[in-house]
């Protein structure tokens, strides 16, 4: 009886190993720049509309997430740069750190 249970267990290991293959998100910023933002807002939020108005930027074609009050994160650990707010990868324009467009939150473990 033990031999039968052991053989079932051994034969089922390859099946269990292949059943756990999942795509992994690596949270890297391959396009754009890594920014540390105080908050991330929807491009349709009232705060973003006010900031864009103050900057004189048309919000017509803006979609996705927008980082608010952002500063660039350079090489991690070299200059002591840390981000205690929201690290994001931004592919769009940055307007002197006020906002950054095309942002996606990332986990950089800073």
Curated annotation (Swiss-Prot):
Keyword Disulfide bond: yes
Species name: Pholiota nameko
Full protein name: Class I hydrophobin 2
Top-rank lineage group of the source organism: Eukaryota
Inducing factors: Expression is induced under conditions of inorganic phosphate (Pi) deficiency.
GO molecular function: structural constituent of cell wall
Family from the record: Belongs to the fungal hydrophobin family.
Role: Aerial growth, conidiation, and dispersal of filamentous fungi in the environment rely upon a capability of their secreting small amphipathic proteins called hydrophobins (HPBs) with low sequence identity. Class I can self-assemble into an outermost layer of rodlet bundles on aerial cell surfaces, conferring cellular hydrophobicity that supports fungal growth, development and dispersal; whereas Class II form highly ordered films at water-air interfaces through intermolecular interactions but contribute nothing to the rodlet structure.
Disulfide bonds: 29-89, 36-83, 37-70, 90-103
Signal peptide extent: 1-19
Record keywords: Cell wall, Disulfide bond, Secreted, Signal
Subcellular location: Secreted; Secreted, Cell wall
Chief localisation class: secreted
The protein's assembly and partners: Self-assembles to form functional amyloid fibrils called rodlets. Self-assembly into fibrillar rodlets occurs spontaneously at hydrophobic:hydrophilic interfaces and the rodlets further associate laterally to form amphipathic monolayers.
Cross-referenced InterPro entries: Hydrophobin
Example of a GO cellular component annotation carried by this entry: fungal-type cell wall
Gene name as annotated: pnh2
């Amino acid at each position: 009886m033990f031999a039968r249970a052991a053989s079932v267990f051994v034969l089922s290991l390859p099946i269990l190993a292949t059943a756990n293959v999942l795509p992994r998100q690596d949270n890297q910023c391959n396009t754009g720049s890594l920014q540390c933002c105080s908050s991330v807002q929807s491009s349709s939020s009232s705060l973003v509309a006010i900031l864009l108005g103050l900057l004189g930027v048309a919000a017509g074609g803006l979609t996705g997430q927008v980082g608010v009050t952002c500063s660039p994160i350079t090489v991690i650990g070299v200059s002591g740069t840390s981000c205690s707010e929201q690290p994001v990868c931004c592919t769009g324009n940055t307007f002197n750190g006020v906002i950054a467009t095309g942002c996606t939150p990332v986990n950089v473990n800073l």
